[in-house]
């Protein structure tokens, strides 16, 4: 591969970053995958698969591993960031001096900025300036199913229409991967952060043993909280009925491939927060997302009772069953009430 002719450079060689790189390469594109640990990248290169997360999916020949960040970023103008939300800004500051002048940035990271609750678009603008085209992809995607080529659909939003069309062309595969362009840049970002929080709550409910009725009620009211917060930010309400909203919410709340759901189930069964995180063994994005979403909601004056009770469990030592009873004991109200 010539150093300057890759279709995409993927930053982040975990399960999801690897799955997206495989998908792009399977579409016939040359793709560079970079990770922060040179030993991990060397292992991926030797094995030609991600044995830790996706052991049964061999890498296409057009997927190239790279441990040198400058080389990886020189390979393509288009950069796909797939890292946990709490290091998103740090990674952008790291890559900025190495990016090509014509670079465009897209991320699959789901979350908000740690501590501040800012949207990742604001973090990107602060780190990279106002001129670079930005995009985000989000939706119901488990890495194993995506890498295996099972049917999957996502939403894509971008600040530049041409960038959106180019990304759709790169990612979309009629056999297995549908990519829907959505003009709502704010809503597509927000859905992925809030659904992680609600998924912890759904897991708690099931861990307590409340059953399918309770889980469904929690998902539905969680969607209300997502939509309410989105409205305060100026998002399009229809976005939350799409892949980046309802789609991702249902997937994450109902399937045990979701780390957030499994984490919540352990809490509902009485396990403490640290032990549950240790047992999961990977990043539980919803743990940090809960604090970030709460900060954002408080700043905007948006009431999010489910998010608040999950926060109380994660950060204040409240028992999951007590949090559930607090929600059930709330005053009667109209279903369409704003609080």
From Swiss-Prot:
Positions in coiled-coil regions: none
EC annotation from Swiss-Prot or TrEMBL: 1.1.1.94
Location, primary (coarse class): cytoplasm
Residue sites binding sn-glycerol 3-phosphate per the record: 110, 139, 141, 195, 248, 258-260
UniProt-annotated catalytic positions: 195 (proton acceptor)
UniProt record, GO biological process: carbohydrate metabolic process; glycerol-3-phosphate biosynthetic process; glycerol-3-phosphate catabolic process; glycerophospholipid biosynthetic process
Binding site for NADPH: 15-16, 36, 110, 143, 259, 283, 285
One Pfam family cited in the UniProt record for this chain: NAD_Gly3P_dh_C
Claim: tRNA-binding is one of the keywords in the record: no
Enzyme class: oxidoreductase
Source organism, top-level taxon: Bacteria
Molecular function (Gene Ontology), one example: NAD binding
UniProt xrefs under Gene3D superfamilies: N-(1-d-carboxylethyl)-l-norvaline Dehydrogenase, domain 2, NAD(P)-binding Rossmann-like Domain
Keywords: Cytoplasm, Lipid biosynthesis, Lipid metabolism, NAD, NADP, Nucleotide-binding, Oxidoreductase, Phospholipid biosynthesis, Phospholipid metabolism
Gene Ontology CC: cytosol
Keyword Transmembrane helix: no
Catalytic activity, as annotated: sn-glycerol 3-phosphate + NAD(+) = dihydroxyacetone phosphate + NADH + H(+); sn-glycerol 3-phosphate + NADP(+) = dihydroxyacetone phosphate + NADPH + H(+)
Pathway: Membrane lipid metabolism; glycerophospholipid metabolism
Compartments where located: Cytoplasm
NCBIfam families per record: PRK00094.1-1 (NF000939), PRK00094.1-2 (NF000940), PRK00094.1-4 (NF000942)
The protein's role, per its UniProt record: Catalyzes the reduction of the glycolytic intermediate dihydroxyacetone phosphate (DHAP) to sn-glycerol 3-phosphate (G3P), the key precursor for phospholipid synthesis.
Family: Belongs to the NAD-dependent glycerol-3-phosphate dehydrogenase family.
Protein name: Glycerol-3-phosphate dehydrogenase [NAD(P)+]
Organism: Klebsiella pneumoniae (strain 342)
Gene that encodes it: gpsA
